[in-house]
Amino acid sequence: MEKMIKKMNAKKMIVLVGLMMGMILAFTACQAKPAEPQTVKVGTLAGPTGMGMAEMIVNGVDLGENVTTEFTVAGAPDQLTASVISGEFQLAALPSNLGAVLFNKTEGQVVLGSVNTLGVLYIVADETAGVTSIADLKGKTIVASGQGSTPEYVLNYLLEKNGLTPGVDVTINYVAEHSEAVTQLAAGQATIAMLPEPFVTTITTKKPNIKIAVDMSEAWEAASNGSQLQMTTLVVNKEWAEANPEVLKKFMEAYEASIDSVNENPAEGAKNIVAAGIMTDATLAEKAIPNCNIVFIPVKEAQQSLNEYYTILAGFEPKAVGGKVPGEEFYVLGK
């Protein structure tokens, strides 16, 4: 009897050990497999649009195991759009209105990730011109670039909100490039201009008699009941975002930290901006950073002001937002 009991106990032990081994093997099999290697491709633009990404470009970013990041700095938006549409680029910093255009063009496959700069437009004027507000432009002539695009729509909106008719109450001489407006101011051929950064810093440094007369972001908020002028955004490939939520989360956290770093330490930020190929002059970059309104605004917080901005642009030219104001699906990453 005693031998029989021992045999039974031995069998039980064997069964128990077998069960434990089976559980260990099953547990091991259920562990997450290592992430498939992937390269996250990110596009941005030279100038203010790309400034907030400079630290990430120079120092790199950790997006997790087997994930590498490849940044491209382009001189113009049209150098990035085809790659964003095709899905080759998973993320891209672009003018806000172009984000809307791409959302409509891809039938919702390009969506909002964040807002990364507010307005970078300013009215600059000779200190003798007597301009300190939009209303002061009545009867004046200004030089500007960006005809047929966002700068023109922003200027016209603010003139009209201040009771001025473009081309009637204010003469606007459009030139092809921002640099042409700077040249005219420097030569004394013009005394008032609308310019974006860093061209504002370029002319005010070169000609101390030229001052910032109107911050167009502040004028926009005053004219639109507090709505922000959100001029550039980070857009994201929707399919990729849904398949890689943790990678996207890490990117956004790193992006916000990079933006904070540039704003908190402009001198170091300027070095990174030059090293990243976003600007060529560190001194100019450092002076321009405070006026570039570099921000990180998550989708949920950006939606109301951005929707109002798109609505205003569409009122001037529907093509500016791709034919129609983006619907709720554009803001899906904020849900």
Feature locations, PLM:
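Short, solvent-exposed loop/beta-turn-alpha elements that line the ligand-binding surface or hinge
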Residues: V61-N66, E218-S227, I294-Q303
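Short, low-complexity disordered leader/linker segments with a strong preference
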Residues: M1-T39
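Short, glycine-/small- and polar/acidic-enriched structural segments
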Residues: A35-T165, I172-Y174, T191-E197, A213
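Pocket-lining segment of extracytoplasmic ligand-binding domains
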Residues: N97-L98, S179-N272
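A bilobed periplasmic-binding-protein/Venus flytrap-type ligand-binding module shared by bacterial periplasmic
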Residues: E55-I57, L121-V131, L229-E246, P298
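Secondary-structure end/capping motifs
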Residues: A241-F316
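Conserved C-terminal helix/tail region of periplasmic/extracytoplasmic solute-binding proteins
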Residues: N307-K335
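Solvent-exposed, polar/charged alpha-helical surfaces in well-ordered, non-transmembrane soluble domains
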Residues: M51-N59, D78, A82, S86, ...
